[in-house]
């Protein structure tokens, strides 16, 4: 997914700046666009006719053995289940949407994640959770896992701490894929409520068309605010940054997230964030976020109404900007990479 791509590429960039001693091999069944920069980082293409998950389970272990890998890292919820002598396994666990909100996922994805993801968790030597929230979810669903196996290592962001505040335009922004879990129908209904109250909300949606997006598009087609909503599709990094910076506010009504990177991207752009009160968003933003119940269009409409009644809410106060700095300094890819490297090295070390 696009979120995993951002996670993996940024973490690889940061690891390459940090570590010139250990040797890394990146295995892929097909060519990738990402370019490695260091001599100690190697891309190994292993052409395969198998679907990704079957390549991972049945072909990848042979390469891991041939290349004499000490520590194998699975960055996306699953890992090969075969036990290889001398190989330690590290797994990143992003979220448990497949258990909490199964109906918001394709059945095939849900089945694969449930079958292989659960077994991957049980067969890993170290588990990296992207937030405290995900670590709590892991302990809830897998209560038998030893606490010392679980490491909370937050995602990062390439921050622009000194960024100037840009002039705000009269639109709300949502970024992410158009799929049921992102809860865009509730956002649509909230904006309809605001229109009934005499406000003129405009919304821009940036992101790829996800699974089951037709139902949202049908709701939009029949909506009283359809002419005020723009679906922009997948955008370049530069265009997305410009949208983040010029939006009146960023709205993120997602039902469930393991981390919630878009809220951090909006904060980085000095844009006010309205977000679901669930999952880890409060963990990231603290008092800087404006929260609502994602299950209720009335709660969301009431939150957004504050913005239309008080336009200065689009801008952070000096005190809030100080807090923003602290948050962005905490969530850096450099910190993420340092802590990941520490997990890799402790797994590679022989137990005394």
For each predicted feature, which ranges?
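Carbohydrate transferase catalytic cores enriched for Leloir-type hexosyltransferases
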Residues: 1-352
